[in-house]
């Protein structure tokens, strides 16, 4: 991002055309970032509650006063009840490299309790670790050269705009694009309007079809996987007709998706939080 500054104040924000992912384009949120930075309603000093919880009785204090009071309260709790009585909780407001990790170093040093900050991403992360051994994905710069792209449980135009623009490049280059989502979230690609909460059934149905059709890499499975026979038994009960009834997707679409997954290489599968955010 390129920022123009005059007299110590940011005047304009522009995308960096040399950036390999954004390619000079800023999302709508960042295009309007200066409105938030210089908003007269923005809080610039800490507020301390001086009334009962649930009321709007606050007063401004200095940063030094805030640091001192917070440190005093934390030390008081640690002395009386132990460090584990302190429970830090933070997530999306602190996703920068420094402002995310530095507070965690403080809490780790103090020996406080720690909990997962989210009910969504860690569930998927743990599942990915069990299946793949890790949760790191492909480089987004590989999207334009992919021949098959699947966005599963992901609203690309809204939550992954830069990646979605790369998908457009790939489609222009001849790639096939699927979107698996109950809602139609864009004009691009083939939309599979899956019934909510049935993504696992679709995955098992795809696996069963590929296994029974002998469309999988046996050498890779034998060399790098454990429990394949048990997985085969679990997937066996999910034939295309049953999966179609449960997911509200046609047998033809499920078969086409399955065969494309086997035949079209290289592929790029992007899993979104949508798969995890249901009961």
Locations of the language-model features?
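N-terminal export/assembly segments and adjacent metallocofactor-ligating motifs
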Residues: 1-213, 250-254
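Active-site phosphate/pyrophosphate-binding segments
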Residues: 206, 225-279
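Short, flexible active-site loop motifs that bind/organize anionic cofactors or intermediates
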Residues: 56, 189, 221, 233, ...
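Scaffold signal of the M16-like zinc-metallopeptidase fold and its non-catalytic homologs
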Residues: 39-43, 211-238
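Short coil/turn segments at secondary-structure boundaries
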Residues: 82-91, 119-122, 218-225, 245-246, ...
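Intrinsically disordered or highly flexible coil/loop and linker segments, enriched in small
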Residues: 79-83, 116, 176, 215-216, ...
């Amino acid at each position: 991002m390129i920022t123009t500054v005059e007299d110590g104040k940011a005047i304009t924000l522009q995308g960096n055309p040399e950036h390999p992912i954004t390619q000079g384009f800023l999302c709508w949120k960042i295009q309007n970032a200066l409105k938030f930075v210089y908003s007269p309603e923005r809080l610039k000093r800490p507020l301390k509650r001086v009334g009962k919880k649930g009321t709007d009785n606050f007063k401004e204090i200095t940063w030094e006063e805030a640091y001192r009071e917070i440190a005093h309260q934390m030390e008081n709790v640690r002395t009386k009840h132990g460090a584990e009585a302190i429970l830090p909780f933070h997530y999306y407001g602190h996703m920068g490299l420094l402002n995310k990790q530095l507070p965690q170093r403080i809490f780790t040093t103090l020996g406080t309790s720690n909990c997962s900050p989210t009910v969504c991403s860690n569930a998927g992360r743990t599942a990915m670790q069990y299946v793949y051994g890790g949760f790191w994905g492909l480089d987004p710069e590989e999207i334009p050269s992919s021949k098959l792209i699947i966005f599963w449980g992901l609203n690309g135009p809204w939550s992954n705009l830069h990646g979605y623009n790369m998908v457009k490049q790939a489609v222009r280059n001849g790639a096939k694009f699927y979107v698996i989502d109950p809602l139609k979230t864009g004009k691009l690609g083939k939309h599979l309007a899956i019934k909510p909460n049935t993504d696992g059934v679709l995955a098992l149905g795809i696996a069963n079809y590929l296994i029974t059709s002998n469309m999988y890499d046996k050498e890779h499975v034998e060399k790098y996987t454990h429990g394949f026979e048990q997985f085969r038994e679990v997937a066996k009960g999910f034939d295309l007709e049953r999966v179609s009834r449960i997911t509200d997707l046609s047998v033809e679409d499920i078969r086409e998706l399955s065969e494309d997954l086997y035949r079209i290489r290289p592929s790029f599968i992007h899993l979104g939080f949508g798969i995890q955010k249901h009961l």
